[in-house]
Each structure stands twice: as C-alpha cells, then as structure tokens.
Amino acid sequence: MQGQIIKALAGFYYVESDGQVYQTRARGNFRKKGHTPYVGDWVDFSAEENSEGYILKIHERKNSLVRPPIVNIDQAVVIMSVKEPDFNSNLLDRFLVLLEHKGIHPIVYISKMDLLEDRGELDFYQQTYGDIGYDFVTSKEELLSLLTGKVTVFMGQTGVGKSTLLNKIAPDLNLETGEISDSLGRGRHTTRAVSFYNLNGGKIADTPGFSSLDYEVSRAEDLNQAFPEIATVSRDCKFRTCTHTHEPSCAVKPAVEEGVIATFRFDNYLQFLSEIENRRETYKKVSKKIPK
C-alpha cells in the first residue's frame, strides 16, 4: 500500500491511505542506512487490518525542513504579530530566506491586528512585500482562501499565535495555546509534535514554536537568490558573483538608492551576508586546529 505520513510520535508513524490511518514502524534497515521517515513523506507500507504495520520504502522528497522535521511542503504561512512580540522585519526575512532556499512558497500572515496602533507602518510593509510578490494577508478569510488543496506549514516566532490561529480556522483541532511571559516577552512552547490535519481539501501542520531561526544558506550566491528583488536586479551587475558590497558596476546598490529595492531589505541582506562570511571564517579557524 501507499500513503502519506501525517504524524510521527514515540517511534510510531501514522500513515494515511484511502481515508484510513495506519500505525506503523520503520524497518530496521532504515536506521542502518541513516534514513528517517518524516511527516509528509509518501511511503510504501504493509499493514494487516487492526495490526501494526511497517514502512517499506520512502519516496523521493521534493523539499524538506529540518526544524521542524517535515517534508513535501507546498507553502508555508509565516505568522508575524503586530505586538507581543513586536513585528520584526529582520526575523521575517530570515524565514523568507529559508523558504526561498527550500523552494517553498511563503505566505505572510499578520496576527493580533486588534493591537495595531500605526496602520501606516503595516501598510508600508504590506506594500513592500506585495511588490516583491509575496502574499501578505491580515484576515482569516483571506488566508483560508489560500489553503485550498495545498500542504501548508504554519511557522513563526514563539508567542505570535500559531495555535490560536489554527483553532480559529479549524476549531476541531482544539490545540493548546500559551500566553506571553511578561518577564521575557516570549510565549510558552505549546506545540509538542508535528502533525498534519485535513482542511479545505489540503493539509495543514502546526509546528513547534521557536524564538530564533538559523537559516541553511551557506553561500553568498544562494543568499542573493533568496531575495527575489535583489536576484532580479543583480542580473545587470558586471560580475556574476557580485555580492553588492564592494564590486564595481554593481546594479543593486543604485537600485537601493532609487527605492527600487527597500533599504531595510538590503540592510537585512547585508547582515545575513556578514553572518555567512563570519561562519566561514570561524570554520577556517577551527579547521586549522585539527591535527594532520
């Protein structure tokens, strides 16, 4: 039989096939080969009625996330709150860089709109990200329309209201929610395991919350491509490997000055580039200490 893993918990993999869910385990040869099944995997499996089954084969994945461990994703809703925690374009761009690098379509959703005081600032970000080509939504109804028939991951900083939002769009989930800690300004981790839920002919997944994101981009070229508006303009740079920092005849820096590329987006790009270069330098220093 063939099906999709919709939940992984305590060594068991729950596989959905033809409307039924089967409890399975992975064969020992998966561990020997270093292969781990993840939520979202399409698998071949065997299972007798009312008995535990076994995963026999994992099909090729189109994409994957490490944290949370989930695969074969169509799109990801990045939830950013107006307040508690405050909207942070740097953190949002870290999520977007990760998703662009993984080939996952991003949707930006703004939560806690009732706490909004300055609509002008939100309009600025909505216009900027919209011009780049991102869906930037503020209403539950608009978000629901984008979920039909898709496998969607929900992600965001701890405390932005992922579980609260999912409870609103799919009340049957009844997910646990947490409040913001006054001392830290962070929410309690309320999501315990990654699971798929059926909604609007597609599947949605709530994912464990976290307050920081280490994107998996290690090359300047990949970072360039993860900023779509920079990637487009950089085609006119003199050098194909232009990092838009010191090279002559760079097309990106004038585009920033002219407002074609938002200054805050370019600043975030430069910060991420510096972090990549610093990681490389640290790796070189550590490597030198390894004895021959």
Swiss-Prot record:
Its EC number is 3.6.1.-. Keywords: Cytoplasm, GTP-binding, Hydrolase, Metal-binding, Nucleotide-binding, Ribosome biogenesis, RNA-binding, rRNA-binding, Zinc. It is found in: Cytoplasm. Its cofactor is Zn(2+). The keyword Methyltransferase does not apply. Pfam families: RsgA_GTPase, RsgA_N. One of several proteins that assist in the late maturation steps of the functional core of the 30S ribosomal subunit. Helps release RbfA from mature subunits. May play a role in the assembly of ribosomal proteins into the subunit. Circularly permuted GTPase that catalyzes slow GTP hydrolysis, GTPase activity is stimulated by the 30S ribosomal subunit. This is Small ribosomal subunit biogenesis GTPase RsgA. It comes from Streptococcus pneumoniae serotype 4 (strain ATCC BAA-334 / TIGR4).
